[in-house]
Amino acid sequence: MTRSGFVAIAGRPNVGKSTLANALVGAKVAIISDKPQTTRRAIRGIATGEDWQLVLVDLPGVQRPRDVLTTRMQRRVERELDDADGCLLVVNAEQGIGPGDRFIARLLGGASVPVVIAVNKIDRVTRGRLAEVLTDAAKLDVGDDVFPVSARTGDGVRALVDHFVSLLPEGPFYFPPEQHSDQPEEILLAELVREQVLARTTFSSSSSTSTLIACGSSSRVAASAFSRTSSAICASTGRSLRCSGGK
């Protein structure tokens, strides 16, 4: 009998949710940036084993709503959590447990599904510091299990996958085993372009960027960017995108 289910990945901005989602899936399904609000839509990554399938929903960073965009993103997070079979709360070992983590823990406190905490970026802290953060994570009082992991090196990732597989309900696969994401090709391409825009510009927030991919017999790439960059941003076709905006 196969097991399958949906696991929502929650956490405040920039704790490494997208990097961890990519590590769990074993393929790049979510873009990565050090700028807030990089993940603006719920992205589904699909990890499949011989008799199990985890559909990982990489949620936008959870924070107290401050504007229309974050309010809409927050509502999407809440809807995805309602449909999940489990939840992974990601915290940052470097930064430790802060008010944002406690805010999310309170949101998840009433969840009807298992909640697991992943302390990410353990490769960047000492053993003594890690022990402190693991203790603080357990005090969040949400979920019974805390896993130290490094999405960058892969340490602890296999143990985390095995644990979630043990929690999955029995059921058929939702997607073909070879599929890693439910995102259409044009969306995946647009996100990859946006990742490069964010990497090469001086945006303080990723909410100022957008990309559009038009797929057809001759693919076109367009990006709207309102910042200055000293390097060209290239699409997979090799054509550079022209930056426009203020000086």
Q: What does each model-identified segment do?
A:
Residues 1-87, 91:
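Conserved G1/Walker A P-loop phosphate-binding module
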Residues 1-6, 13, 206, 220, ...:
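C-terminal effector/interaction modules appended to NTPase cores
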Residues 8, 22, 41, 45, ...:
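Solvent-exposed alpha-helical segments within well-ordered globular domains of core cellular machineries
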Residues 27, 46-50, 62-65, 80, ...:
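Conserved, well-folded catalytic cores of nucleic-acid-processing
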Residues 81-103, 112-130, 152:
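Conserved Switch II/interswitch segment of TRAFAC-class P-loop GTPases
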Residues 113-116, 123-181:
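Canonical P-loop GTPase G-domain recognition
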Residues 178-206, 220:
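Long, well-ordered amphipathic alpha-helical subdomains in the mid-to-C-terminal portions
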Residues 202-244:
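Low-acidity, Ser/Thr- and Arg-rich intrinsically disordered low-complexity segments
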